[in-house]
């Protein structure tokens, strides 16, 4: 329905003046005639009544378009949306949402975001579909269908004999034989005595072994049936995803970088904070699950989101109507399996709560330590979230990029046995693009939302390429490397960080590096540190990879650090470098240090996470991972071979010249 309000030509009542700034003279200009019309349209949709009001100028594009849904007015959305916002009306745009990352999919242009290829249905021959995983048929003995047919023929003959016997017995009974007579009992006893010496074929009979005795006989038909049942279990995950998710799932990287550059940034305040202030219904409970990486807590802690949540809670507390439905915050520290085993759970819990409070987080309803990879704490977390959310709650999972949100949700769905499409997981920042609404994990009508990772530009890992990022990523339990450092010495952590001990009230201090073992180290004199960096950065000091790669990461800046402690054995303070790891200092006295790293990288001083150092000390000089040693060895061998060939060539040329 469209209602035309006015189509008249209006004339401006205001007489605009054009002022000359040089001579301050106001000159009158003619009144322009503006062809103008306005109107209303009413569009019915399945779930809500939508009214659209459009203000436009004739023969021109739309000036402004607003949309009213159930009385709430907001700017009308464009039909060229790229990412899902997790709203019910997202499904009404006629676009397919990628279940892996939340982007609207399209099959027109492969260079645009959300491209996917439609699946081709191919009829497979069932006779050729004989591939079954070995573990699915473990404990079964394979039997051919030909043998089954022979057995079926034998069974038919046996059935005929039994049938004839039964018919004969019936005729005998009709002739006066009594089944319950003593004569029948005597015959049964005689038969039992005759069969006492017989037993079923067992181990040692023919080719029957203990393994074959334990196995169950399975025919080819039954094998196909088992394969189909196993395929049905995974059918819920056999869905179409965008080309980006396909590349991340199968190759661990984004192949189309041109489409990646067209993706807009995620606006947390507009898309999430405003929805937390106004819940979808008065009876629904809002639960915010904040996911933080344990091995990079300060780098992955979403400070901006925590600040927004704190403001939301303050507004809700001041509002008497909304004070009943305050958002509940649950902090989940993931990847606890990567931390050293000597950290007690109680101490880790206190440390996490203290760091969250220092980061600006509001009051926490609960704190959970979880490992989605090793299934630690997932069951208890799921039970607590269900209890908080209730039957109609909304659970928002937020966190920094690559903090493990999608991995956690996949673990929750497996623990609950919910048939939910697997979210895309990859060691690449920004895997999830749009807000994904996930049903089936929580009870009744409660919903869970997976949100895009929040961008933290101060992370060291964001400066690196994919190969360098793999080197700094901690994938196994982090192991310490400790040095005893004197004043005037420096420790290089790859080509990314340098720590100088400028002065100290004691002779030496202990510095322990907690980072990936793929990152090389070096301990030497501070006076030679600059020369070491220029000569070995990108070669022995990796990452970065490449001789001139360090200059592409930015300029170095110095940060002065004052520390003090009362024990060499117990660490006094941690220096956290966002996106890389942390350094622990142990000393008995005071010291002044200088930390060098690239400009813009976040460096945080905090209480120590691990109070112990490594059981042994590293020697001065280079500490090189095996991979770098092999590469350098191959490179050195090539140089030696090249020099030997050049020397042989020079000798040959000299002899040739002498003969001539």
From Swiss-Prot:
> Where is region (Disordered) located?
127-158, 191-212
Where does this polypeptide localize? Plastid, Chloroplast stroma
Q: Where is the transit peptide?
A: 1-53
* Disruption phenotype annotation: Chlorotic dwarf mutant pale green in bpg2-1 and bpg2-2. Reduced sensitivity in the light to chlorophyll accumulation promoted by brassinazole (Brz), a specific inhibitor of the biosynthesis of brassinosteroids (BRs), via the suppression of Brz-induced chloroplast protein accumulation. Decreased number of stacked grana thylakoids in chloroplast, but more starch grains, and more and larger plastoglobules. Abnormal accumulation of precursors of chloroplast 16S and 23S rRNA.
The alphabetized list of GO BP terms reads: brassinosteroid mediated signaling pathway; chloroplast organization; chloroplast rRNA processing; developmental process; positive regulation of carotenoid biosynthetic process; positive regulation of chlorophyll biosynthetic process; regulation of DNA-templated transcription; response to absence of light
Q: Where is the CP-type G domain?
A: 273-457
Q: Which GO terms describe its molecular function?
A: GTP binding; hydrolase activity; mRNA binding; rRNA binding
GO terms under cellular component? chloroplast; chloroplast stroma; mitochondrion
Q: What tissues contain this protein? A: Mostly expressed in stems, petioles, leaves and flowers and, at low levels, also in roots.
The biased composition feature labelled Acidic residues covers: 130-158
Q: Does the keyword Membrane apply?
A: no
Kindly summarize what the UniProt induction comment says about this protein's expression. Answer: Induced by light, but repressed by dark. Up-regulated by the specific inhibitor of the biosynthesis of brassinosteroids (BRs) brassinazole (Brz).
Xref: PANTHER family: GENETIC INTERACTOR OF PROHIBITINS 3, MITOCHONDRIAL (PTHR46434), GTP-BINDING PROTEIN BRASSINAZOLE INSENSITIVE PALE GREEN 2, CHLOROPLASTIC (PTHR46434:SF3)
Give the similarity note.
Answer: Belongs to the TRAFAC class YlqF/YawG GTPase family.
Q: What does this protein do?
A: Required for brassinosteroid- (BR) mediated post-transcriptional and translational regulation in the chloroplast, including accumulation of chloroplast rRNA. Involved in chloroplast differentiation.
Q: How does it assemble?
A: Binds to chloroplast 16S and 23S ribosomal RNAs.
Q: What's the protein called, per UniProt?
A: GTP-binding protein BRASSINAZOLE INSENSITIVE PALE GREEN 2, chloroplastic
Q: Tell me which species this is from.
A: Arabidopsis thaliana (Mouse-ear cress)
């Amino acid at each position: 329905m469209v209602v035309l309000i006015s189509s008249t030509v209006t004339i401006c009542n205001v007489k605009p003046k054009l002022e000359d700034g040089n001579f301050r003279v106001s000159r009158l200009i003619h009144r322009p005639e503006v062809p103008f019309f306005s109107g209303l349209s009413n569009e019915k949709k399945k779930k809500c009544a939508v009214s659209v009001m459009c203000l436009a100028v004739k023969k021109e594009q739309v000036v402004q378009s607003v949309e009213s849904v159930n009385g709430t007015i907001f700017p009308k959305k464009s039909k060229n949306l790229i990412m899902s916002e997790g709203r019910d009306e997202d499904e009404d745009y006629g676009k397919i949402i990628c279940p892996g990352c939340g982007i609207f999919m399209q099959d027109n242009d492969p260079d645009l975001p959300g491209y996917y290829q439609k699946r081709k249905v191919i009829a497979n021959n069932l006779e050729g579909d004989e591939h079954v995983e070995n573990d699915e048929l473990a404990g079964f003995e394979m039997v051919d269908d030909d043998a089954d047919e022979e057995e079926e023929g034998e069974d038919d003959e046996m059935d005929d004999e039994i049938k004839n016997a039964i018919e004969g017995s019936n005729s005998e009974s009709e002739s006066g034989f009594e089944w319950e007579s003593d004569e029948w009992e005597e015959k049964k006893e005689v038969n039992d005595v005759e069969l006492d010496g017989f037993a079923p074929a067992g181990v040692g009979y023919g080719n029957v072994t203990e393994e074959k005795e334990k196995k169950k006989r399975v025919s080819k038909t039954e094998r196909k049936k088992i394969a189909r049942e196993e395929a049905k279990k995974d059918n819920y995950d056999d869905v179409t995803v965008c080309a980006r998710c396909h590349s991340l799932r199968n190759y661990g990287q984004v192949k189309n970088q041109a489409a990646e550059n067209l993706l807009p940034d995620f606006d947390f305040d507009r898309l999430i904070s405003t929805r937390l202030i106004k819940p979808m219904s008065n009876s629904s409970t809002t639960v915010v699950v904040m996911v933080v990486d344990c091995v990079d807590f300060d780098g992955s802690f979403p400070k901006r989101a925590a600040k927004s949540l704190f403001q939301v809670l303050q507004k809700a507390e001041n509002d008497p109507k909304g004070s009943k439905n305050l958002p509940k915050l649950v902090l989940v520290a993931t990847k606890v399996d990567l931390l050293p085993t000597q950290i007690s759970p109680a101490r880790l819990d206190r440390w996490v709560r203290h760091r969250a409070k220092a980061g600006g987080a509001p009051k926490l309803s609960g704190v959970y330590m979880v490992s989605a990879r090793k299934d630690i704490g997932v069951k208890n977390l799921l039970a607590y979230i269900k209890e908080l959310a209730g039957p109609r709650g909304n659970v928002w999972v937020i966190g920094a990029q690559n903090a493990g949100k999608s991995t956690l949700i996949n673990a929750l769905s497996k623990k609950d046995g919910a048939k939910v499409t697997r979210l895309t997981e990859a060691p690449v920042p920004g895997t999830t693009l749009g807000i994904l609404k996930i049903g089936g994990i929580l009870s009744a009508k409660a919903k869970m939302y997976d949100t895009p990772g929040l961008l933290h530009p101060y992370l060291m890992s964001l400066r690196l390429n994919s190969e360098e990022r793999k080197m700094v990523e901690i994938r196994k339990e982090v192991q310490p490397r400790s040095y005893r450092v004197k004043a005037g010495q420096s420790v290089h952590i790859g080509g990314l960080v340098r720590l100088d001990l400028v002065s100290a009230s004691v002779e030496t201090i202990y510095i322990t590096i907690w980072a990936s073992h793929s990152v090389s180290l070096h301990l030497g004199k501070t006076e030679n540190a600059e020369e070491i960096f220029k000569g070995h950065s990108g070669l022995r000091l990796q990452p970065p990879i490449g001789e001139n790669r360090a200059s592409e990461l930015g300029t170095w800046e110095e940060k002065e650090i004052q520390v003090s402690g009362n024990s060499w054995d117990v660490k006094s303070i941690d220096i956290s470098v966002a996106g890389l790891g942390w350094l622990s200092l142990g000393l008995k006295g005071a010291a002044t240090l200088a930390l060098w790293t690239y400009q813009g990288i976040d460096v945080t001083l905090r209480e120590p996470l691990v109070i112990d150092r490594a059981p042994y000390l590293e020697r001065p000089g280079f500490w090189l991972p095996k991979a770098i040693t092999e590469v350098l060895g191959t490179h050195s061998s090539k140089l030696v071979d090249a020099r030997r060939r050049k020397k042989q060539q020079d000798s040959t040329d000299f002899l040739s010249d002498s003969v001539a």
